[in-house]
Amino acid sequence: MISATRAAAARLVGTAASRTPAAARHQDGWNGLSHEAFRFVSRRDYASETIKGAVVGIDLGTTNSCVAVMEGKQAKVLENAEGARTTPSVVAFTADGERLVGMPAKRQAVTNPNNTFYATKRLIGRRYDDPEVQKDTKNVPFKIVRASNGDAWVEAHGKLYSPSQIGAFVLMKMKETAENYLGHTAKNAVITVPAYFNDSQRQATKDAGQISGLNVLRVINEPTAAALAYGLDKSEDKIIAVYDLGGGTFDISILEIQKGVFEVKSTNGDTFLGGEDFDQALLRHIVKEFKRETGVDLTKDNMALQRVREAAEKAKCELSSSVQTDINLPYLTMDASGPKHLNMKLTRAQFEGIVTDLIKRTIAPCQKAMQDAEVSKSDIGEVILVGGMTRMPKVQQTVQDLFGRAPSKAVNPDEAVAIGAAIQGGVLAGDVTDVLLLDVTPLSLGIETLGGVFTKLINRNTTIPTKKSQVFSTAADGQTQVEIKVCQGEREMAGDNKLLGQFTLIGIPPAPRGVPQIEVTFDLDANGIVHVSAKDKGTGREQQIVIQSSGGLSKDDIENMVKNAEKYAEEDRRKKERVEAVNMAEGIIHDTETKMEEFKDQLPADECNKLKEEISKMRELLARKDSETGENIRQAASSLQQASLKLFEMAYKKMASEREGSGSSGTGEQKEDQKEEKQ
């Protein structure tokens, strides 16, 4: 990597920084930068500061999420409140404003499809005008809207939420799961992202972590995390491929594992290819068949579509282990002739035919990744499968045909990523000392130069963290400011790539064009997020450049979302407190009434009536429980319990005295009998 960098620097250095390209002389009004000599500086900084407390590893998935922590040298996947090791990445808002996360949200999706958000990870860090987003708007029942900054947000009951907020609500559930297990606050986290996520998507994921109250120590790539889970206890040196086909994204990474060093050689993928697309393809097939048989079009009925969507997902999963499944949805819809039921058989071969194009889309990225890593399939010692979709036999066969070997099933495809994130958390905390992770940036990073050309500063598959600099000059006489547009992608023209942000450097002393020397430095951190600084070499004065990104969340946005998340957390705490108090009160009422019936002969009638009045008051309080605090309900329940205990204490004393009287009376009679016998 170093030698390649030096070679690139040697080729580029030599054009005098004071010269301006001829093209600059023919473009009046150009306020950007001329393309001048390069100076590259490479930096690798893998050390981390000591972290206090546990670091949780979170796989924030498109369909499901998972959380793990290190216990000694082993990572442990944690069960949520429902007893499951994975949590659906689903968030819903009910009509009364209640927020549901995970399985409770997924269960009510059929009756509340317009306000139940799923697969929002596909929207994170994306613009509303992105073709993929526009495609998604036609496939989901909830509203995807254009935010004021042009990003894609979602809407429920008239309120707008950023995808980062929805992700934060899922992360809060993961955080709560970890805290319930640890018994204390979980503050630090490592969160995973698809390897092919760009800078905006990575930053938006970090924002989600911040909104949820987590300190995100590192954002790492999902295939890399899975490789850590696979190779932590392996001593053999080898090159492996990680084929990760999850709910919403596809990644392929080629890694070399050597004596505890996990070096990513290349990565590739598709951030809009996953299980959701397989579900959607099957849904379209079912809807088409239903219309052919009944003449009824289901596309306008969101509730019916949600039922079909859930049935499609279930059928997809069943066909991984069965060769045929039945899809039965009674009373799916109705027309003038009456109710309509959906009954159809689906074979594995039929399903494979429906999704064959989706599976084929994973082949080209795999071939490109091997080409970039300069390895052939014979060099790869193991192929690891990650993501729920890799359970599909046709996917496994495709992988085997592609790499010439049967894929390994050494890791759990649903849990490996979270386990790897926890291991990386252990590395950062200093608990795991024999592992070094060298990841790469998935996409080239550069700037727009004269004529709209995309000039690459950092090439794709460069090991991160890395730091590179380039010297620029002005393109016009007397120019006092320059505009720098930072882009990410592989196209030759800047306009065809993803615009990450633009910077304006002001305060340049007026001088003839080509004279000022402005050194712009791009610093790509271990999270794959870029930071930029600039220095006027003539004056030695360093300027701070703030990204004027056209999208993304501002600092104020994030602070407001943090407050909203805290508000929801407080509401959740109050709700939980109220539910626990209601359960306690209902238990006390039940126990009191049972004991009153059991001891009715021993209890004074007037005291019983008083207690019955207390129970009636308690029931009245429970009838308006939604407007009462948990503390009020708990206090009232405690008062009822104290009153009942006093009454039952009287009953016990009465019963005890009666038993004693009965016992002494029996003893006296026995003595008289013995006396008579002796006489």
Swiss-Prot record:
A single Gene Ontology CC annotation of this entry is: mitochondrion
Subunit organization: Interacts strongly with the intermediate form of FXN and weakly with its mature form. Interacts with HSCB. Associates with the mitochondrial contact site and cristae organizing system (MICOS) complex, composed of at least MICOS10/MIC10, CHCHD3/MIC19, CHCHD6/MIC25, APOOL/MIC27, IMMT/MIC60, APOO/MIC23/MIC26 and QIL1/MIC13. This complex was also known under the names MINOS or MitOS complex. The MICOS complex associates with mitochondrial outer membrane proteins SAMM50, MTX1, MTX2 and DNAJC11, mitochondrial inner membrane protein TMEM11 and with HSPA9.
Using the record's annotations, give every residue carrying the modification Omega-N-methylarginine: 513
Tell me the protein's name: Stress-70 protein, mitochondrial
Q: Where on the tree of life does the source sit, at the highest rank?
A: Eukaryota
Catalytic reactions of this protein: ATP + H2O = ADP + phosphate + H(+)
Q: Which residue stretches belong to region Disordered?
A: 656-679
**Residues with N6-malonyllysine modification:** 206
**What stretches pass through the bilayer?**
none
Q: Which NCBIfam families match?
A: PRK00290.1, PRK05183.1, prok_dnaK
Gene of this entry = HSPA9
Briefly describe activity regulation. Answer: The chaperone activity is regulated by ATP-induced allosteric coupling of the nucleotide-binding (NBD) and substrate-binding (SBD) domains. ATP binding in the NBD leads to a conformational change in the NBD, which is transferred through the interdomain linker (IDL) to the substrate-binding domain (SBD). This elicits a reduced substrate affinity and a faster substrate exchange rate. Upon hydrolysis of ATP to ADP, the protein undergoes a conformational change that increases its affinity for substrate proteins.
Region of interest (Interdomain linker), residue spans:
432-441
Subcellular locations according to the entry: Mitochondrion; Nucleus, Nucleolus; Cytoplasm; Mitochondrion matrix
Q: Where does ADP bind?
A: 63-64, 313, 316, 320, 388, 391
Give UniProt keywords alphabetically: Acetylation, ATP-binding, Chaperone, Cytoplasm, Hydrolase, Methylation, Mitochondrion, Nucleotide-binding, Nucleus, Phosphoprotein, Transit peptide
From which residue to which does the transit peptide run?
1-46
Its Enzyme Commission number(s) read 3.6.4.10
List the biased-composition ranges (Basic and acidic residues). 669-679
